[in-house]
């Protein structure tokens, strides 16, 4: 089991708990409050917890992370999932994005 503790945000993230599903849209918040949209195309469970494989919907860049936080608890730079109104993309659209990214 892996737990990440944020000293600044006073939050804990348990990677053994799956927080999003495949085809779910993720919001990336960067420097200067810039926003990117990612979509999860694969959820993998490893010995260290869940790993989310995603693709940027604009640049088609593939990335992965094991830390996703709820959008309702936004605190600085990071990747967030909408825990109130989750958004999903069509599986066919996601497959096309992944193919373009590879």
What is each model feature region?
Residues 2-5, 54, 78-80:
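Short polybasic amphipathic segments
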Residues 2-19:
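Mixed-charge, Lys/Arg-rich low-complexity intrinsically disordered regions
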Residues 4, 23, 44, 71-73:
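N-terminal start and proteolytic maturation junction detector
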Residues 8, 60-102:
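Intrinsically disordered, low-complexity, charged/polar segments
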Residues 17-30:
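Short coil-to-beta transition motif at edge beta-strands of beta-rich domains
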Residues 31-35:
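Short, charged beta-turn/beta-strand-edge "cap" motif at the junction between a beta-strand
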Residues 36-44:
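Short beta-strand-centered aromatic/proline hotspots
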Residues 44-64:
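Basic/aromatic-rich interaction segments and small domains that mediate binding to polyanionic partners
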């Amino acid at each position: 089991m892996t737990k990440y503790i944020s000293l600044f945000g006073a939050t804990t993230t348990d990677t053994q708990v799956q927080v999003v599903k495949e085809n779910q849209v993720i919001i990336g918040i960067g420097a200067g409050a810039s926003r990117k949209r990612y979509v999860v195309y694969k959820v993998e469970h490893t010995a260290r917890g869940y790993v989310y494989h995603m693709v940027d919907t604009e640049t088609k860049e593939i990335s992965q992370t094991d830390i996703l936080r709820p959008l309702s608890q936004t605190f600085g730079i990071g990747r967030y999932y909408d825990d109130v109104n989750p958004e999903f993309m069509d599986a066919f659209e996601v497959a096309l994005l992944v193919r373009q990214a590879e």
